[in-house]
Amino acid sequence: MRKLLYILIFTLAASSAAAQQMPERRLVRKGNRQFRKENFDRSVDLYMRALGADSTSFEAGYNLGNALFRSERYDTAEQTMMRAAADSTRSDTERAEAFYNLGNTQFMQKKLEQALESYRNSLRLNP
């Protein structure tokens, strides 16, 4: 009986520790739910908190850029998408999507030459 109690305590402690190591993932999922509901300001907040938990999270940064774009905060969305597009650890497809969205933010700001170059970069990575 005592052995079973120790196993139970160990299992609970291990699962609790694992859950605490992934707060960024949980925040990104919550942000995604808010984004789907078109609560863009709330999703921006959640993605920013996720980046606070893990500043290297590509998904949090990329999704933050999309939420900022949908909130019509194009200048901040542009900066965020630039970071996502520059992340050389990601696949060409992911970076191509980031460059495409970067082009969209630049287009909305009437930065047409920069937008064109971002679209070209997207096509170079994923023709």
What is each model feature region?
Residues 40, 47, 81-82, 119:
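Hydrophobic/aromatic packing residues within the alpha-helices of TPR/SEL1-like helical repeat arrays
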